[in-house]
Amino acid sequence: MKFFKRYNIDQKTLDEFKKYYVLLHGPFPNDMYDFEEETNTSLDEFYEFFALITGSLNYIIEDKKIPRYQREMLKKTFYEHYPHFRNYKSDILKYQELSECLEFHEKIRILINKLITGG
């Protein structure tokens, strides 16, 4: 059953997305700040990517159209958006909370893409 006019989701999927949205609004991983300090990098890109995913999920929950530029951004992984972080991939894995948070955002990004592309 189509629940929304803009997205082909049912109540169960909507409830699941709402749970994800709540989880995405939790605090940032504690070890993010350790990563920043120990690698001498900025966390700005993480904040930006996390906001992209959370904001896009909110558009879906509110049955609003995700802007075209944002849909285009959702096609890319974190490492495609910020290629300089590819050099830190193995370092990121050492920070369990950060790694899990990034992985969760990627999972949601993929779900959003499937929904908006009909795939």
Curated annotation (Swiss-Prot):
Q: Which InterPro entries does the protein's record reference?
A: WapI/YxiJ-like
Protein name, as recorded: Immunity protein WapI
Native organism: Bacillus subtilis subsp. natto (strain BEST195)
Gene that this polypeptide is encoded by: wapI
The UniProt function text for this chain reads: Immunity protein component of a toxin-immunity protein module, which functions as a cellular contact-dependent growth inhibition (CDI) system. Neutralizes the tRNase activity of cognate toxin WapA upon expression in E.coli. Does not inhibit WapA from other strains of B.subtilis. The WapA C-terminus cannot be expressed on its own in E.coli, however it can be cloned in the presence of its cognate immunity protein gene. Cell contact is probably necessary for growth inhibition.
